[in-house]
UniProtKB/Swiss-Prot annotation:
The lineage of its organism: Eukaryota, Viridiplantae, Streptophyta, Embryophyta, Tracheophyta. It comes from Cryptomeria japonica (Japanese cedar). InterPro entries: CemA (IPR004282). One of its GO terms (molecular function) is antiporter activity. This is Potassium/proton antiporter CemA. Its main location: plastid.
Amino acid sequence: MDLIPRSIIRTLFRFWTELTSQSSSLAIHELEVAKYKTFASLQYLTCLIVLPWAISISLQNSLESWVTNWWNTGQSKKIFDYLQEENAIRKFEKIEELFLLEIMVKDYSETPSQDIRVEMQKKMIQLVKIYNQDCIHIISHLLANLIGLVLLSVCLILGKKKLGILNSWIQEVFYSLSDTMKAFSILLVTDLCIGFHSPHGWELMINWIFENYGFAHNERIISGLVSTFPVILDTIFKYWIFRRLNRISPSLVVIYHSMNE
């Protein structure tokens, strides 16, 4: 099906319409189809990006009150403690160290040890309140994101026709570029995702996901993901170049390798 490049097929089709004197009506029809594809694609793309994000943000505030009541029952904390236990212990240790440092800096020689324990308990109670609020925020944020993900899946399932139009429009825009611009676009995307400096971006993104979804910070898991994702993407991309681009446009592959060197 992909043995003959699309550009040759389009050229032969236009040449045939010129011979049959249907070029003017075909040009008007192609212009109308191009306008419809562009409008439908941009509308659907905006819907996919904005709608789940807007609904997720609007639901987060309303879900927070319900999550607060659910969290304060006490039974729910057992479900979430294993995710936040390390973070909580780390924060408790940090508060304890800061408080002991404050005792050493200030003159607490005349302060009874009982008063010091009371101050320590106040600090710990304050930290527990902050910990509970963080857990409530993480759970409400997680629920809102899951609802947004479900809505995005529904949009993709119900909008298969528009998704096909969007895919066709993106391919037409890409293939309408010159080989140099195609190679530049591919090189820009690949350098951002799998380039020399990409691990820093992957690390920031994975840390952000861990913090937003309430997972404890684990350097081994993060370093493993950072070292794995770019390799997988690089393999997929090389296969795509070998399987598809090398067959559709060999000149594009040559230009890409020249720019990459």
